């Protein structure tokens, strides 16, 4: 059975909800899942999983990493995830110019780790609506299919 590690950062609860949607979608595809809040996670935990997923929000007017995600983000740069499949999703507010910038930032760091991109990023405006849930389920299906093909 394939395994997945889902790490999330959530201030308002929106990304925790997104992580739960992702977790349920993975479980429905018979993937073993462990979900952890980012301040309690270590990027090295990804080395023990087939699938690596980050769900994060973007903080402030300048598209900053959440404070609780900075160490995880920096440490992720030093991990070799060759042979793993990754995905990044998260919520933000389209009011800001840097809507979901951190989602793109995490995707760029995953590229540096040698991991294989499983799906395009998913960006959710505020909280997940029905259409967003469909996008997240497709995101998970694509990641699992990519992992199965390795």
Question: Where do the language-model regions lie?
Answer:
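Short polar catalytic/cofactor-binding loops
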Residues: 9-13
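Short acidic active-site motifs
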Residues: 40-45
């Amino acid at each position: 059975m394939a395994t997945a590690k889902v790490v999330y950062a959530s201030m308002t609860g929106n990304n925790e909800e997104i992580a739960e949607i992702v977790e349920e979608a993975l479980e429905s595809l018979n993937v073993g899942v462990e979900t952890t809040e980012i301040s309690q996670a270590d990027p090295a935990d990804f080395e023990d999983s087939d699938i690596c997923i980050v769900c994060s929000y973007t903080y402030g007017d300048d598209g900053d990493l959440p404070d609780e995600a900075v160490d995880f983000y920096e440490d992720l740069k030093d991990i070799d995830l060759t042979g793993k499949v990754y995905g990044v999703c998260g919520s933000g507010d389209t009011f800001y110019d840097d809507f979901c910038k951190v989602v793109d930032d995490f995707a760029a760091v995953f590229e540096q780790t040698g991991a294989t991109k499983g799906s395009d990023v998913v960006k959710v405006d505020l909280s997940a609506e029905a259409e967003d849930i469909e996008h997240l389920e497709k995101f998970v299906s694509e990641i699992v299919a990519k992992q199965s093909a390795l």
